[in-house]
């Protein structure tokens, strides 16, 4: 039998049938939130259809939920309608939903793994581009469009073309203060936001194996920002130990059989990839984006690049436009860039490990006077409860950070948390596009430690200086 990649194994084991170069694949887990599901539920109602497999669906409101006082509900009428519609649809169709006020409520890509609803070997879909997060478990996970959401609800299947396979190997040991977020940004800086287009990426190598599940989720979350369809990491003891005992994990009598299968979920020796990228872990430093695309990124001790030195005219004009939007001058040291707001949260970096890293930097310090708002938004009610049990909320509050309720928050301008025009934000989210965090807002993507460091310094600063 020929050697297979992890992607081959996951894709091939879910093919129902193939014709004309496309495959009908079976979907094991369907995660749902309030933004991309109402049209799908409406379509089912109009056609008189039921959900094909209701126990495969798990729903949670996240994009529109307020992160401040929830006792008065949701102020914005459109946001409120989306969340209420999800509640009603879940009641009508018998779907399990973790509603606002439930401690399990949170960002869909934090909630799924936390509940053990994401398991190795699964196909996982959600009407959300950052579904690639779940690939950290040795699963095939990707975002789908709203019409596909309805298709999966009705048939449990999806028509897919098989992607090419790329392996990104990160060998060596990451330095202190260098995180999975820095690895993700460094990779995107190297291959570009189109570097992974048409590929499913497997992240491998000793540096990846040494990451926690939280770190692996951060990395796979950003695979989509490299243009990839999916990101994934092979199963090992770290994966299995994380899943064990979670509410949706296999029960004790099925556990050994599940683990035996999960241990096969890695690329075989000699498996052929369509592309291989190699990066040395020691070369990666804390990263900061300077432009309006995740590929516009550099190390903290570097400078804002000069478009006049770029020979490609298309790239040059893109850089010029980005610098104009961001209000930055070429050759400015990154550490000289002052900030107005700090956002620690999102499906990229709102898990307990992320909050611990930020708290370690903030402890005993205070948010700088020029920073108007520094906010910490846990990824779920359970993450929030654990952080409070560990006293992290006290560290943040004493340092002048706001401690919020779980949700997508300032990752995107779809709720009350947003930037005003011209405001500059150090953000642990995943996209720095124009207007992503609010019209005219300027986003710099960083790790949680780097965001906390920027909050206390009032400008970007090498987090390693504060950790020494």
UniProtKB/Swiss-Prot annotation:
Family to which the UniProt record says this protein belongs: Belongs to the aconitase/IPM isomerase family. LeuC type 1 subfamily.
Any single biological process term in GO: L-leucine biosynthetic process
PANTHER family named among the record's database cross-references: 3-ISOPROPYLMALATE DEHYDRATASE (PTHR43822:SF9), HOMOACONITASE, MITOCHONDRIAL-RELATED (PTHR43822)
Enzyme Commission number(s): 4.2.1.33
Function: Catalyzes the isomerization between 2-isopropylmalate and 3-isopropylmalate, via the formation of 2-isopropylmaleate.
Cofactor dependence: [4Fe-4S] cluster
Superkingdom of the organism of origin: Bacteria
NCBIfam families for the chain: leuC, PRK05478.1, PRK12466.1
Keyword hit for Electron transport: no
GO terms for MF: 3-isopropylmalate dehydratase activity; 4 iron, 4 sulfur cluster binding; metal ion binding
Cofactor binding annotation: Binds 1 [4Fe-4S] cluster per subunit.
UniProt-annotated binding residues for [4Fe-4S] cluster: 347, 408, 411
Reaction(s) the record says it catalyses: (2R,3S)-3-isopropylmalate = (2S)-2-isopropylmalate
The keyword Nucleotidyltransferase is assigned to this record: no
Protein name from the UniProt record: 3-isopropylmalate dehydratase large subunit
InterPro entries in the record: 3-IsopropMal_deHydase_lsu, Acnase/IPM_dHydase_lsu_aba_1/3, Acoase/IPM_deHydtase_lsu_aba, Aconitase_4Fe-4S_BS, Aconitase_4Fe-4S_dom, IPM_dehydratase_rel_enz, IPMI_cat
Record keywords: 4Fe-4S, Amino-acid biosynthesis, Branched-chain amino acid biosynthesis, Iron, Iron-sulfur, Leucine biosynthesis, Lyase, Metal-binding
Subunit field text: Heterodimer of LeuC and LeuD.
Pathway: Amino-acid biosynthesis; L-leucine biosynthesis; L-leucine from 3-methyl-2-oxobutanoate: step 2/4
